[in-house]
Amino acid sequence: MEKPRWASRISKRNILVIINLMKVIIELFGASRDFSDQNSLEFDIENNSSIKDVRNKILDYLDKNFKGNENFIKIVNSSAFCSNDNIISDNYKITNNEKIAIIPPIGGG
């Protein structure tokens, strides 16, 4: 099998690190709409990321943009996530350009 052209340029001294990233779109519903002036958030995440990783990415975003707003943190930690109208677990593996919805708890009276 023939080596790709780029392989001949790599030596022990030159280590090429390729990070495979994919895009995930988080659709915002209910109280999570306060996270942005848009209807969604977009993040670049590593391949093979899970909902748990996305939840942490959202928490990092909130910390950076809203100084760790405690109410927003509670919303993220207690929210469900869904894909294709199905509730998904924190272990669910995300695919590239997948749309995920965050579904905050709903209170009423």
Where are the language model's segments positioned?
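Ubiquitin-like/PB1-type beta-grasp interaction modules and other compact soluble beta-rich domains
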Residues: E2-W6, K12-G108
